[in-house]
Amino acid sequence: MPTIEQLVRKGRQAKPKKSKTLALKGSPLRRGVCTRVYTTTPKKPNSALRKVARVRLSSGVEVTAYIPGEGHNLQEHSIVLVRGGRVKDLPGVRYHIVRGALDTQGVKDRKQGRSLYGAKKAK
């Protein structure tokens, strides 16, 4: 236990914050190539077929990324943009694919909340 005098001289050292998206290597986004596109089931109590992809990133790491929105055009060898952000009911999925960037098309017929899904404004 330090004395008050020692704390006045040195102070406490803050613990460094641990990143939750290590594979991005400090970048906000990373480009990658889909190695496998498939569906998986969420953990209890939810039930669905969630669309996910295994992606080999430009940093050399292979991660599982979620494909948001209804319907997608991704297949093996598609070039995608990956951002951080986990999916709570899919264990091990800590990344999202950015819709409307590179080979990923935006969500068709989306009217509200379009920004996250790469959907253009309807004329």
UniProtKB/Swiss-Prot annotation:
Keyword terms: Methylation, Ribonucleoprotein, Ribosomal protein, RNA-binding, rRNA-binding, tRNA-binding
Record field: compositional bias (Basic residues): 9-20
Protein family membership: Belongs to the universal ribosomal protein uS12 family.
Gene Ontology biological process terms in this record: translation
Disordered, as annotated region: 1-21
Protein name: Small ribosomal subunit protein uS12
Subunit structure: Part of the 30S ribosomal subunit. Contacts proteins S8 and S17. May interact with IF1 in the 30S initiation complex.
